[in-house]
Amino acid sequence: MLQQAERRIPPFRRRKSTPHEQRLSHHSSNNNNNIDSMSKAIAQYTEDGVHAVFEQSGESGRSFNYSESIRIASESVPEQQITAYLVKIQRGGFIQPFGSMIAVDEPSFRILGYSDNARDMLGITPQSVPSLDDKNDAAFALGPQSVPSLDDKNDAAFALGTDVRALFTHSSALLLEKAFSAREISLMNPIWIHSRTSGKPFYGILHRIDVGIVIDLEPARTEDPALSIAGAVQSQEALVRAISQLQSLPSADVKLLCDTVVESVRELTGYDRVMVYKFHEDEHGEVVSESKRPDLEPYIGLHYPATDIPQASRFLFKQNRVRMIVDCHASAVRVVQDEALVQPLCLVGSTLGAPHGCHAQYMANMGSIASLVMAVIINGNDEEGVGGRSSMRLWGLVVCHHTSARCIPFPLRYACEFLMQAFGLQLNMELQLAAQSLEKRVLRTQTLLCDMLLRDSPTGIVTQSPSIMDLVKCDGAALYFQGNYYPLGVTPTEAQIRDIIEWLLAFHGDSTGLSTDSLGDAGYPGLPRLGMQFVGWQVAYITEKDFLFWFRSHTAKEIKWGGAKLILRTRMMGQRMHPLSSFKAFLEVVKSRSLPWENAEMDAIHSLQLILRDSFKDAEHRNSKAVVDPHVSEQELQGVDELSSVAREMVRLIETATAPIFAVDVDGHVNGWNAKVSELTGLPVEEAMGKSLVHDLVFKESEETVNKLLSREEDKNVETKMRTFGKEHQNKAAFLVVNACSSKHFTNNVVGVCFVGQNVTGQKIVMHKFINIQGDYKAIVHSPNPLIPPIFASDDNTCCLEWNTAMEKLDPSNENVTVGGVDVIGKMLVGEVFGSCCQLKGSDSITKFMIVLHNALGGQDTDKFPFSFLDRHGKYVQTFLTANKRVNMEGQIIGAFCFLQIMSPELQQALKAQRQQEKEFLGRMKELAYICQGVKKPLSGIRFTNSLLEATSLTNEQKQFLETSVACEKQMLKIIRDVDLESIEDGSLELEKGEFLLGNVINAVVSQVILLLRERNLQLIRDIPEEIKTLAVYGDQLRIQQVLSDFLLNIVRYAPSPDGWVEIHVRPRIKQISDGLTLLHAEFRMVCPGEGLPPELIQDMFNNSRWGTQEGLGLSMSRKILKLMNGEVQYIREAERCYFYVLLELPVTRRSSKKC
C-alpha cells in the first residue's frame, strides 16, 4: 500500500495452521511467538515471490484483478521464481531520473557502472565520449588506461574504466578521495561536488556495495541554504525543536506521539499527506495517524494485507531507512555496467532506486505522484539479538504523499531520518511503559481474583467484580465448573460449550489449553453453527472436567474506516490497486479471524489457571497445610543468624567503600558516615553522628533539595553542596552527586534515608570558573594539570572551537589514547569530529549527541550523559558528558562547553567483564533452551513407549521396572519444563503435590546411579525398611526424586574406587499429630568411606550467592528446593566416612494412616 521500496501485489492467503500448531504452550510463549513471527515472514516471501503476475499481465494486455488475487489459495512457488523476485528487488538495474549514479571500484576509482543519464547531467557532450556501439574503442576497454588530465576540461571522457575523479573539479576530487578513505562513509554524506565540464553542483551521496562504492548524484541549487553551515545549523535547530516537542509530550500516549510526529514531518517537508503506518503482529498494516490537506479523503483507520508491503521491502527499509519517489509517472533510467561483473549492481542503499511498475500504478490510482517513506525502527526481543545486543525491529513507516512531483533535498531527508530515530527511541519507551502498565493492570486483576478465591468459591471469579472478563480484552468469557456453566458477556450456549469440550478432550486432551484466533483453522468442525462472533478462543484446563473460556469475535467487526464508506466506489475499484481495494481485500481475509491474543494476555490466563489448580488442590488438603505451614516460621528464625552475618559484612563494606556513603534517621540526623565522607568534608565520624543534615552539613542552596530527599522521595543523580570542616577545608565546599533510597526496618517500615554519592568537586570548580569566565581562560583550558578534565567547546554553529590538552590525551596512563587536537578546530562536532574522526556507535548515538549539544545552545544544560566513542586508534573510550551553555558579557548564548568525565580503568574493566559475562550468560541460556527443546522430543517418545508397555501384561518385577522408568522420565521432563533458577532462589517455585509411594521414589533415585556404580566398581548397600516401600505420602514426588538423586549421585561420584562402597539408609518415624493427620519424619543418609566431596563443592552448596562448578550449582539448587519442601540437609564428615544427612517431613495419606 504505502511502501516506498519495490512493491508486489498480494495474491495468496497463508496456509492454514494445523490443530497442533494452534496449541497453547505456556512455558515458551515468547519464543514460540518469535518463531511464529519468523515463519509468517518466511511464508510471505513465498507469496511475494509471485511478483511476475502483475508485470506479466501488463505485458500481455490481460486484466489484473487485485482483490481476487488476495483470495486465491496458496500454491507452491518455484524457488527460481522467488530468487528472481528477490534479485529484482535488490538489483533492479533502473533508477529514477531526478538524479544519476556512478559505481566505482574503491581502490582504483575506475568506473564500474553508470546510469544512462549521467553524461547529460554532468554536461559531457556526446562528441567527447565514444559510442556504446563501438566495442573496439579503447575508451570502453575494461583494462588499465590513461586517466584523463584533471586540468584539461576537453579531455573529460566518460566510460567504463574511466577514473571518476576526472569527471569533477580538483577540489571535488579531493573530497571524493577523503570520503573513500573514511571508515564509515555514510557519515560524510552529502558531499558537495561540481562537474568538471559544466560546473554544475551536485549532492554526492556515497555508500559501499559488494563490488565498490556507489555515488548517487542529486542536482543541488547554489542558492540552497542547506549547503551553508548556517543553513545546516538552521535545519538542525528545526529538527531539535521537533525532537524536543516529542520528548515533552505526556507519557503513555502513543496516539499523541504519532499525531505529533506526522504534524512535524509535514511542517518540515511540505507534503500533502503524512501518515504513520503500523505493522501488527500478524504482519498486516494499519494507518494509525494522519495529517493531510483538508480536501483529501482520509486513510486513517484503514488496514491492509501483510503482502501489501513485501518482506524484501521491509528488509530494505532496515538497510536504507529513507526512500523517495519524485514522480511515479517518470520513466526509469537504465544502469549500464561492466560485463565482467558477476551480477547486476546492488541498489539497496541507493537514494535513486526506481519503483516497480505495480507500485507506480498503485500511486497513480490513488492520485499520488510523489512520496517519501521513512522507517520507524525500535528494539526487538532480546533473544533475537546477536552477540548479546538487542535486535532492531521494523515497527512501521512514516509515509508522505504528494499530488504533484516533489523532490526533497538530501540534507532535509537526512534531518527527517534523525527525527525518525528520535521518534523510534521515544516510541520504544512508550511501548515499554504501555507493556508495564498492562502488566500492572493484569497483576492487579489477578490479585483481586486470588482474593476472591481465598474468600469465596471459584464461581466468584464470574459472579463478582472484577471478573475474568477484566483480565483480558474479550467479548465474552465463561467458567465450566463441576458440570455447571457460568457465562459472561457474549457467549455460546451451554450445549455448544459441551460440544466444544468434547472436541477439545478428543483432539487437544494432552495440552494445557487452546489459543487460537480462528477456531475454524484450529480444526473445529462446528464453527458454522457458532457464528462469526466466536472465532477467537482461549481455553484453560483447570482439571479434566473444569474449564475457563474467553471469546473474541471476528476482526472485521473491530476494523473501522476513518472517512466516507464509499461502498459503490469500493466495488468499482475491486480490480484496481488502491487503498480502498486493499482494505476490502483485508476484510475478506480477516472476516474469519479475531484479533490475535497477546503474550501478556496468555501469561495472565496461564497464571490464573495455575492459581485455580492450586486452589482446588488446597481445598482438598487444607488440614495438611494447616500443620505443615508453621514450620516456615521456624525456618525464618533459623535464618536470622545468616541475615545478621550478612548485615555485619554490609556495614564493613560501607565503612571502607571508596564512594561517599552516609545515612540519616527519620528526623534527618546523621546515623551513618563512612570514611570517604569524612575525608571529603573533614568531619570525623564521631562528630558527624547526630548532626542535622539540613541545618548543619549542607549549604543553604541545597537545603530544599535535601529536604525533598528526606521526605522519602527516592531519586538518582541529585547534586548536593556539602559544608567542609577543619583548617584544610575552611570556606570550601564539597560537591556530591547522590542517589537516595529509603532505609527500612525488618518490619518494612521506613526508618531513614541512605545516600550513596560520587565526588564531583574538582569538575564543579572547573565548570564554575568556565561558566562565570573566572581566571585565565586559556591557562585553564589547556593546562596539563591532571585535575583539569577533558574539555571541548563549540560555537553557535556547532563547530569545534576548543579542544584542550586533556581531550588530546584522555588517559594519562596510556600515551597512545589520543583523539587529535588542532586538526579538529573548525570542524562540525556532529558528523565530522564525532562521527568521522571519533566514530560513535551507530546513528542513534549521533542523534542523542546532537540533541545534547543543541539543548546546551538553547540554554538547557545536560549533566552526566553517557557518551562513548572510538578514538583514532580504534580504542573504545567511555565517558560521561556534561554540556553547558557559553555566554558573552551581555549574557547571550554564543556556544557550548562540554566536559568529559572518564570512567576509571577499574570501572571500565568491571563493565567489560559484566558485558562479557552477559554475553556468555546469553550464550549459555540459548544452549540451555536448545537442549531443553531437543530433549523434549525423545522424552515424548519414551513416554509413548512406556504407555504401550503399561497396556501389556507384565510380571510384578517388570511393572516395578516400568514404574521406575516412568518416574525418571517425569522427573527429567519436570526439570526441563521448569528451568527457572530465580523462582528457586527467591522461594516462589510452585510445587506440584500429590499422593505417591515412597518406595517408588527410592527405586527411581537408586536407578539413576546404578550405571555409575558399575562403571566405578562400587558396591551399593541398602538399609531400607520393608514397610517404607508401600508407604503412601503426600508431596511433590518429582522434586523429592530430583533432590535425593542429586545428593546420592555426588556421593557415588566421589566415593573411593575401585572396590569401594556406597550406603543409603532410610529411617522412618510416624507421628500422629491429630485425628486424621499423620506425619512421616524421614531421615535419609547417603554414606561413603574416605574424604568424600571436596570442600569447595560443599562451599558452593551452602553459598547463597556464588557457585564455582556445575555440581556446586546442582547441590545448591537441591538444597534450596528441599528447604521449600520444609526439609533440610547437612553434610557430615567423620573420621573414616562422610555422608549427606537429609530430613524431610511429609503428610501420610489416609490409606497409609490406617495401616500405621
UniProtKB/Swiss-Prot annotation:
GO terms for biological process: detection of visible light; red, far-red light phototransduction; regulation of DNA-templated transcription. Contains one covalently linked phytochromobilin chromophore. SMART domains: GAF, HATPase_c, HisKA, PAS. CDD domains: HATPase_Phy-like, HisKA, PAS. InterPro entries: GAF, GAF-like_dom_sf, HATPase_C_sf, His_kinase_dom, HisK_dim/P_dom, PAS, PAS-like_dom_sf, PAS_2. Residues 1-35 are annotated as: Disordered. Keywords: Chromophore, Photoreceptor protein, Phytochrome signaling pathway, Receptor, Sensory transduction, Transcription, Transcription regulation. The keyword Transcription regulation applies. Pfam families: GAF, HATPase_c, HisKA, PAS, PAS_2, PHY. The keyword Transcription applies. Residues 253-431 form the GAF domain. Residues 930-1150 form the Histidine kinase domain. Homodimer. Belongs to the phytochrome family. Regulatory photoreceptor which exists in two forms that are reversibly interconvertible by light: the Pr form that absorbs maximally in the red region of the spectrum and the Pfr form that absorbs maximally in the far-red region. Photoconversion of Pr to Pfr induces an array of morphogenic responses, whereas reconversion of Pfr to Pr cancels the induction of those responses. Pfr controls the expression of a number of nuclear genes including those encoding the small subunit of ribulose-bisphosphate carboxylase, chlorophyll A/B binding protein, protochlorophyllide reductase, rRNA, etc. NCBIfam families: sensory_box. This is Phytochrome B. It comes from Glycine max.
